[in-house]
Amino acid sequence: MRNIIVSTILLFIGQMSWAQTITGVVKDTANSPISYATVVLYSLPDTTYVSGAITNREGQFKLTAVESKQLLLQVSSIGYKTRYLPATTDQTIVLEQDVVSIDEVVVKGTRPISKLISGGVQINVANTVLSGIGTGNDVLKRIPMITGDNGRFKVFGRGDARVYINNREVRDPSELDKLNSADIERVEVISDPGARYDATVAAVINIQTAQKPGEGFSFNARSSFYTGENNDYINQISTNYRKEGLDVFANLYYSNISSLLKGDISQIIDVDTLWCQNSYTNGGMRSNTLNGTVGVNYEINENHYIGLRYDIKTSPQKNTKDIYLTSDIYADGVLYDKWKNRELKRTASRPVSQVNLYYAGQLGNLSVDFNADYYCGGTDTEGMHVEMSEEFGERTLYSTSHIDNSLLAGKLQLAYRIGKGKLSVGSEYVDISRNDEYSNKDLPGFTSKVNVDETNLALFTEYKVLTNIGNFSIGLRYEDANYDYLVDDEVADDKSRHYRQWFPNASYATKIDKVELQLSYTSKVVRPSYRELSGNLAYGNRFMIETGYPFLKPTVRQDLSLMIVWKIVQASVRYVHQKNAIVTWIDRFESDPKVSVLTSRNLHELPKLAAMIAIAPTFGIWKPQLSCGIHKQWLDLTSYGINVRLDKPSFFGSFNNTFDLSGNFMINLDAAYNSKGHLSTSYIYKDSFLVDCSISKSFFDKSLQVKLAI
């Protein structure tokens, strides 16, 4: 068959000696367009790379061959069989769904399928069970390597992730709850972010949405009620108007959410007396949010896109935090005191405004991507701290806090194809201003006024090239970051910082039979915050105060990782070396040794190892996903002449189950486990186990969904 294809190409191309434009559309067997399919043009007979493209949301692509050559097209997309065919113009290419057999069990490509991309893994969501799971939060919770909820997520082995939607940074965590899972095309989990991302970003989650079909008006309404130990409410209405290349949208979202805080804390201080404080925490927080969004996207033509979005967010009522702490204090095993503490905070939020402007374009072989953000807002908080001691009586402490924040950010990236590769260059600028005033008239020395001005100018470049032995990528980022701190309107030279640093990254990806492998190296940084540098005292209780350490150095992090994807299996191994690791540290208060000081310190080094594996098969209506992994660190400390080894590994596992039933019913049963173990300078001394269950039914061709969750 290959000989016939090549002969046809020779016959067709032999008559042409000028530049050609190869166009077409990629569809599935149901005649639906396949967006984001990869189309690569090769010359024959040596299969030299000529050009490549990604299909748009209508499945269309366009390629240019600048010389007279014998040409071959390779068309591929996750979940479909790859096709090779002669390169002609205005052709319709149909891809068949991929089906593999594992031990006599047929596994179809309707399950979210993993695919290695530069720096991470891409997960297909459209046309899978995840597309009907609920919200963006629900989708991310069921993707391997990701943990978290409510817009705040971590990537396994890396830490906190920065979330993007269509390459726009998400600055409001509630935005993921507003995103319908049916609107998500795919999710990119970038565990090794390259030079185009901020050097402080440990991981990236990039959500790509699908363009809604059709023209005219569309509406979407959602109302959710959750009950248990507390009641939560979410109401949302969205509307769109689409006409040709114009897309106008608006969204109104209200939430009233409660969260419970419970736990046991033991604090032991061994000085001239052995002090032991056993505490029980019980309380909760309630927050309410009203968020409005309006925006417009405009497709000028197939090569130029522009968009503008405005968000405003406020809290109609004050958000509250009400925590009770009951403590028993022992001195050398003898009861010393009992107390009950109550911490009550009421926060009023001033309206938060955010504006985003973007442009994406293609000028021949040059692609342009520009994003700009402006953000401003603030809060006012009133606090009350009540201490009721059996031995020392009762006292009440009052505090106030006033915070103003603003941000201006812009990023420009240019990409140009050179030979078989693509060269990207760009620049990013961020300007952040924060004013923080804290007053506690009942405790002298606990009042402060701090102004923080942070600027960061970055230049970056990346080059990616496809070769016969695999894909290579190399990048370099330079950052000039300036942190100016004013305390009580005076410049704080001991805390202000100016960093000029280089951050390289590199990766190599290849495919051996059906196994995809990627080896990556990245260099990142963790810079100390003002709170970690400040010498101001923050009151906790009679036995605990918090302060910073002005001599902290930035943590330089070196990561080496190996990622593997084979059919429905995904695995990774990561080694991390942190120099000058910033860790939480507990010291003694100089004037009163029984009082602990919670602060930060640098460790000379902190090496870690993380490994995980996930498998996601399909057995008829049952679609399970099993993940497990291990964290291990090597840390020996000496404090006050005592040697401590903190190297006990911790394990985690999750088992998510989706049952896609007839009648548009769906059942989800999810379980997660985390073991005891050391985490930096802390020890998690209890295993945790969590189970979630939900059942949902869709009506009116999936335009209405009713869901019951426990």
Regions flagged by a language model, labelled:
Residues 451-454, 494-497, 525-579, 597-610:
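Outer-membrane beta-barrel signature, preferentially recognizing the C-terminal barrel domain
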Residues 62, 142, 168-194:
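Short acidic/polar hinge/loop motifs at secondary-structure boundaries
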Residues 90-96, 136-139, 173-174, 189, ...:
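N-terminal periplasmic accessory domains that precede
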Residues 40-42, 74-80, 90-129, 148-150, ...:
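Short, acidic, small-residue-rich periplasmic hinge/interaction motif at the N-terminus
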Residues 407-411, 456-458, 553, 559, ...:
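Outer membrane beta-barrel strand-and-loop segments of large Gram-negative receptors
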Residues 208-223, 262, 289-294, 320-324, ...:
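Surface-exposed extracellular loop regions of Gram-negative outer-membrane beta-barrel proteins
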Residues 45-60:
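Short, acidic Ser/Thr/Gly-rich low-complexity loop/linker segments typical of extracellular
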Residues 291-315, 339-488, 511-516, 568-573, ...:
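Face-selective signature of the C-terminal outer-membrane beta-barrel domain
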